Amino acid sequence: MPAAAGDGLSESPSRFLAGEKPPVHLEETFLPACISNVSRETLRNFQHTKRVGSYLIGRKLGEGSFAKVREGLHVVTGEKVAIKVIDKKKAKKDTYVTKNLRREGQIQQMIRHPNITQLLDILETENSYYLVMELCPGGNLMHKIYEKKRLEEHEARKYIRQLILAVEHLHRAGVVHRDLKIENLLLDENNNIKLIDFGLSNCAGILGYSDPFSTQCGSPAYAAPELLARKKYGPKVDVWSIGVNMYAMLTGTLPFTVEPFSLRALYQKMVDKDMNPLPTHLSPAAISFLRSLLEPDPLKRPNIQQALANRWLNDNYHGKGLHTYPNRIHLEDLSQSVVLHMSEKLGYKHSDVINVILSNRACHTLAVYFLLNRKLEHYLVNMRKPDINDNVCHKNQFHQLEKYKMNKNSYEERRSKDLEKRGEPQQRPIQRKLDKCSPSHRQNACLTPQGHSNKGPVKERRSSKSERESFGGLSPFHEVRITKTGCMTSCSLEYLEMQSPDPRTPKIMRRQDSHSQETVNVNMGSRIRETHLNVVRSFESVNREDQIESLSPNHQYRVIGSPVSFSPRHSSERTLSPIFQFDNTSPSKSHFNQASFTYDDKSSPSSPESMSPTSPHSPSCNNNISGNLGSPNCVRSRGRFPMMGIGQMLRKRNQVVSPKGEKPLETRMPPLHQMSPGYASFNSSDMNGFC
């Protein structure tokens, strides 16, 4: 069983042994939806003949002397498995088959290794036994040899090394396979060896290596001479079989063949070392190692540890020593994300899940854990699991991936770099769907228009790189954050636009320069940004997941502003807060950056008259913008605007032209004489000398 792919707990693992369940939040999800959910199309498209338990029985993959192997689909996880189907009638008639079936289940529950197939579940019906194992999509190694005629030496070295590692693990556990052949070697999705079929294996842990076996087992072509001679044998019979498999990989044939077939003649060829000719392209080290494995005398034949230390086998594997795999998963290696998902979402008892996994007992609980964990591993590999050095638990790879996507692979950072290379202003408007906010939200939302100069419009020029860097010293696409007080903080508020687009359809709009934008005074910019900041504040945080319903199509909100200079603040201090002009609203005495907004509502009788004073065709724009845009009367419009989410603070590239003959919004609003005591006021006379 593979190691854990994710970890969702920070508590001590010893608490799990006591059966204590970790605290779980109601809204917490432990696995991504693509892992925890199974689509109906997956179940519908799987061709199957019947269903047994939680498995759909599909096409036949192979057929042996004792059973048939079919492809299956686990309906809980949507993962494919291999199912060995054994007929009960045949098993009961032959006690040897029944004995081998019981032995295979017992041995595979004892063993856990990456090059040995994992037994997941055992089912029994009225007519059949079902052994559920992990599926190896790479197929049989014999098919690969048939296609290529023979394998290259470096490829054969890889497979032989993996086979020896698996056999060494078996021998350390006291298990002798006795039936190692090409047909029992499968390939997984990563082109690695998987050893199957333990029907003829025997457990030497009970008898010990000092009392070897005496039964004749295995295929004669792969069997050691002592097996054919019905002599007592030990675990070195597997070493001989590895030599036969190595010869078959390198040549595509068997080392010892006789015509017509005779066990006595075959045995005599083995004893006489009458091996079929070897290809001349093989290296001397490979030939020497192969002859040592096919030594007919068991006393001269190397054991599995000596074979693993051979120089040819470890070529190109320097520094990769023998790694021992425990036959039981340790508690700290459990995938806590999968365990929590099973106990909280699938209804399994937490202590039962832990006990089944630690004991490696084949049942449906183990199958669910193994398949979900493998599914999570594939998900992390496909998403290019990052290498993050932070305070997150090193096993919590899913949460590391989410944090990496937000901090390292943000589209805004890549977009800003591209714009800087092209020398264009870094403006990127996106339309996002708005949510119908409650009245309390609308009352707390505020769009603040700022005063502007009464000077005529001048030709707009693009700000230089030094000017762009002076805007707070941060990228305009700096990440928007939520402070502890619930307010949104950002330094990218130069252009704002909020419109109601088509549902869930963000659109990218091309930038069109407007002649109504004013030039920022570079020489006075350092003093202005110390006293003035054009920002918008949202007094309550908005949960973006709750923004599902869109506003009515007849609502349209826009806020337009000129580029401003931002004072270099700490990220925690860049809170969106409103700034108003209270004492004097005359644009001749105070110079503000130009900002305006329009509110179009078909349900309001005055909505057709609303327009944007910054429009090129606006009368106020043609008359040197004589409207009082800095008036605090616009505070009345706060109740009409919904809460602003993070994705709604967007930069404007298009200025929508309003119909001619419309009056600005502030001319049809009554004056507001009393302001909320929570707003900070300042005297406009402090701005003297700056304009």
UniProtKB/Swiss-Prot annotation:
GO molecular function: ATP binding; protein serine kinase activity; protein serine/threonine kinase activity
Similarity-based family: Belongs to the protein kinase superfamily. CAMK Ser/Thr protein kinase family. SNF1 subfamily.
Biased composition (Low complexity): 604-620
InterPro entries: Kinase-like_dom_sf, Prot_kinase_dom, Protein_kinase_ATP_BS, Ser/Thr_kinase_AS
Bias-annotated ranges (Polar residues): 440-453, 582-597, 621-631
Biased composition annotated in UniProt, kind: Basic and acidic residues: 406-425, 457-470
Pfam families named in the record: Pkinase
Keywords recorded for this protein, A-Z: ATP-binding, Kinase, Nucleotide-binding, Serine/threonine-protein kinase, Transferase
Organism placement in taxonomy: Eukaryota, Metazoa, Chordata, Craniata, Vertebrata
Record-given protein name: Hormonally up-regulated neu tumor-associated kinase homolog A
Domain Protein kinase: residue ranges: 55-313
Gene Ontology terms: biological process: intracellular signal transduction
CC annotations in GO: cytoplasm
Alphabetical list of SUPFAM superfamilies matching this protein: Protein kinase-like (PK-like) (SSF56112)
Enzyme kind, highest EC tier: transferase
EC assignment: 2.7.11.1
Region described as Disordered: 406-475, 499-518, 580-640, 655-679
Presence of keyword Phosphoprotein: no
Catalytic residues as annotated in Swiss-Prot or TrEMBL: 179
Positions that bind ATP: 61-69, 84
Native species: Xenopus laevis
Chemical reaction(s) catalysed: L-seryl-[protein] + ATP = O-phospho-L-seryl-[protein] + ADP + H(+); L-threonyl-[protein] + ATP = O-phospho-L-threonyl-[protein] + ADP + H(+)
